[in-house]
Amino acid sequence: MKSNLKWTAVVSILLAALLHLPLAYAQVRTTSGAVSKSSGIQHPKELERRILQLTNEARRKNGLASLYPDNDLAAKARTKSDDMLMNKYFSHTSPDGKTLKDRFKEEKPAAFQTISRIGENIYMGARFDYFTDIKTQARMIVDGWMTSPGHRRNILDSNFTHLGVGVSAKDKMCYATQIFSQVK
């Protein structure tokens, strides 16, 4: 009986510790996102929506307007998350040296002219399907960004008006990217 109680206590402590790691351990439900047939990468739309919702809640709590969802920015955010996942890196600068501004200028130079400001938040975490639900995973991601000064600054930047969120998951990894913009 004592050994069962000790085992339960150890497991509870380990689970609580994992929940509070800087890179949140989280889940992506395969039923809530599209799967790329060629790569097996999942794009869980419900998680993306929840991250957007929680980001806007954080802004409203700080007296700021909500950000408008932007499908073009979301596509760029998914591409960034896919790139980090497939090329196994975690950085705002890709292995080929490209930054967010470089990617914008290359992909849609005309569209880039309508944007006066852009910003990017990125996340990488292990994925445990049995560990949390979508709401908890989104909360862990956004809370992590809110405790990081640079990421918090992006979320609470009053100049930003639009946001795209892109999440990519495969095997045991999950990457999320937020791209913020201010339209001229």
Please report, for each region that a protein language model flagged, where it lies by residue.
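A short, structure-level motif marking secondary-structure boundaries and short turns
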Residues: 39-42, 65, 136-137
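Bacterial N-terminal signal peptides
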Residues: 11-20
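Short, well-ordered surface patches within globular domains
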Residues: 43-110, 152, 158-164
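A well-ordered secondary-structure block
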Residues: 100-182
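Bacterial N-terminal signal peptides that target proteins for export
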Residues: 1-10
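Short, contiguous pre-domain boundary segments
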Residues: 31-41
